[in-house]
């Protein structure tokens, strides 16, 4: 039997002890930052019996993405969309790739007509980035608040009224050097919105491998481009094209055949035991690709 837990579960969940010495293979996931299996061995809070005697696999956020699917399914409901706007884009931290996308949308003339927000703006957040490959200046943007998530410390899954008035959701994921899909993408998919996800090259391909489907009228070729600056340009161009060629109701109608199926896919992928435990089998989609990339501490 294989059981999936988070690092936090390993440190704080006493139920783990009942599986000690039972022959379980542990799958330990971390979804926030990049670590390695050395992270566990260096952490003084991790029980030594676990490191020494158990068989475990460690995967960082490039591989353990079920967390955000689970959280989305539990917190988001399928919501009717009454489109007034072409798209909405909600940003928390103004990372350079997000600013570059916003700048280009503004230059192309569509940003001001659609709701967008920044919930944080600090020079250190903007300066710290692995996205220097953009090689372009980004204009500082003031805080613009549509929702109260960051202000009132409310749920990540609370959205402003403009969310349900927008035909498309632009999901600018936090990382561009790896495929890391969060609630930014999963939540609008779960709500029933056409979602254009932008992250590391292959993000949309990853979504398709998980069973999500999208209209053929949307050109996702940007997703295969490894050069970040070019990917930003192609993404902004495609968003602008859709906004020019379709009205908001037409975009909603375009996505209608996929709306319910994508929501059901999230629900299916989120079927887990309490406290993020999950029995894994070889039939779980995409087990093989990442199984070759992570190391085993075999008994």
Please describe what each predicted stretch is.
Residues 1-171, 178-299:
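Pol beta-like nucleotidyltransferase catalytic core
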